Every structure is written in C-alpha cells, then in structure tokens.
Amino acid sequence: MSVRTPLRVVATHDFCCAYPPSPTSYGSLPGGEGLKRALVALREQGPIVRADAGDFAAPGALSTLSGGKAGFAAAADLGIDVGVVGNHEFEWGIEHLRAHAPETGFPLLCANAPDVGLPPTSLVDTDRGVVGFVGLTCPDPEVYVFAPRLDPDLGEVAIGHAEELRVSGAQWVVALVHDGVDWHFGREGYEAHPERFSEVCRPWAYAVDAIFASHTLGRWIGRVEGTPVVQPWPFGAELGVIELELGEEPRTYCVTPETGGRWGGAGGELLAEASSRVLGELAEPMSSRSGGPAPLADYFARALREATGVQAAAVDMLASQPPVDGVLSYLPAGPVSEADVLRLYPWPDATVAGEVEGEELRRVAHAPWPWPWSVWGFDAVDRSGAGIATLAVLEGDAAKHVERTLGRRVEWRRTGVGLREAVGRVLS
C-alpha cells in the first residue's frame, strides 16, 4: 500500500537573481538550474506549491545588466506559483514594478501596500486541498529606495485577509512575509535572534497556519504563538518546506538543492556575456566576514582610492552568500569576470569625495557597519591622521554612514568614477 504524501509548500527568499552557480566560501550556490532540478525531484515525491518570499528580481548581476527588467522575466522559469513583493522589487520605482510584475507568470502579492495595485492574496488549488496565501511586504519604510505607502496595522491586514481566504475555501492559510529574524555571527557561530520578528507577527500569527520569513538573510525554524515559521538560508541555498495535512500539525524543515549548471532561462545570454568578460586575476582567494575582517571589501576600497587619486576610501559591501560560516562575500583565486564584480556589488555605484580631518578619518576607518549582513571596507595611504584628507565613498548609504559617524554634514562632490570601473582598473 502506497503512503499518501502530504502537500508541501516550498519557498525561497532573497534569491537576488542568483542564477549562476556562484562560488562561495563553503562551496557553491545552486543557481537557477539547481533550484529547478530540486523542484523536479520534490514534485516526483508528491504535490508541492512553490512560493517565494520576495527579493527574487533584484538585486543581482542580471538585474543590473538589464536595468531591473530581466529579474522579473527570469523568475517565470523558476516554477513559482505565488510570491510576495520584497523591498528590492521596488528598486526602480512603483510603476516599473507594476509594468514588469505580469512577466513573472505568477501572482505577486502585496497586501499591506494596497496603493501599489497588486493582489493581496491568492488561492492555489491542489489535489490535496486549497492553500490560501497572504503576501506582506517589508513593513519598515526605511529599507526602500522607493517606499510605497504601507498600512501601519499589519495585524488588521493579515487577520482580515486570512479570514477572507478561509471564507473563499482555503483549508490552510500561509503568510509570505518579507521580514525575518535578526541574527549575529560570533564565537559560537551563527545565532538567530527572533524576538523583534516575533513581535511583528504576534498580533496576527494565530490567524494563519504557517509563516515564511525572509529579508534579513538569516535562517530560523521556530514558532510564534504556536504558528510554525520557516526562514531558510537566502540566495536559493535552501528551500524552506511546510508540510500540510488536514487534521495534522504542519511540519517544517529545509532542504538543500545541489549545484546546477549555466542558467538557460531568460537573461542567460546577458549573464554569459558578463561572465566571459575577464577583468583580471586574483592570486589568492578573498572574502569578507560578518563583523570583520573584510579584506575583500578593503580591496574594493583600495581600488576606489587608487582610481580617484584620493588619500582614503571606504566601501560598504552587502552579503552575496548566506552567512553559513560567517562569510558574507567571497572571490576565489583565478580569473575575475564582470559578472563576479556585479555579483559582489550590483547596486548603483556612483562615488563621491569630501574632506575630513585626520582624527575624523580614524573614526571612519573603525566605524562598524550597523547591520550584520554588510561590512565596511577601508583603505588609506596614511592612517596616522595627520592633516586634512580627501575621502571617497559610494554615494548614498556609505556617505550617510560617514556623516552619522562624524556627527556632521560633509561637502561631497561626484568623482566621476564608478566603483565597478575602479575595481576593473585595479584588476587589470
């Protein structure tokens, strides 16, 4: 007698256009093809609903190369049935999001920002029953480049839509939330701190059967008010799984896809071209760790300093791999391509320069970046701090970080040199 397999909801989050199987400090990301193969294997075992908890279309090399367009089209090849908008889907503006959301081929949800005009919920019918999804984008307006108007009462939004889904026939309701647990990487390794996120979910968690978390690049499997929560590793490194069976408590766990090959879906030619453009070689591997040290980010800072001809430079570098071992970004020894540099820094890369006093420069050099998923790279001709120095940084968050550290405004001026151009010069 065959065993009836439960319905599984399988989700990724913060995939960030990680379509190439990029190297990491611990091995490799699976890439888009690896994810597709993992889903085929799961479907052979029984019915699944494929979900995504946001930031699938940006950031990443493919997103930057295509002006924010190809990340939406490529997602159509990942077998996703339903997803929620992450803050980075807003990176090119609300109108851009509205225009390209249909290219994904799946319902892209956004219940707590109704002005965006995307559906708040979706029903997925399977031969095991009907699953209702409510999508909640990140409730923190500070994380957006172009923030939508966010409903301040997340509880009312989630509870109301969960009730509507059940009235419409949903036997289970799953919340896709673009927010997640805080974390720290210390002497004991990776430590999740779910307290803040639990407070976000506590008023409404009872109204849903399960929650997929995301956004913070961390990992956690736990419960809020008895409701199971799964936040797998980001970048497709893991698939979060919630097993649903009528009359049974949901079961939660994660699975690890194997590494796939070159991406053959939408945007594959753009990625192949960028991968074929070799900028130079590294004699030794380089990486940056959460909390430091960050020699890879320091290397980017050195490239910016040399390209702009200033005395010092600083670079903020976000994670491009899960912090499984504390490493946030990694380049192996050997050839470095344009795609590699874009993977490490896919953001707008205009740089600015301004004057700081010697003591101020020392403070900037040792100013910790406020989030564990980013590092602060620094390089200077002379760190002794004698006299006034010109400091180059990335426009935006890095410039603001310097001003917060110094407690004053800096008279910034554009350098005319992009960070990726600077890195290309030092590599060549």
Residue spans of the language-model regions?
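Catalytic centers of hydrolytic enzymes
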Residues: 12, 17-29, 142-147, 153, ...
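Acidic, metal/ion-coordinating pockets
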Residues: 1-260, 295-303, 351
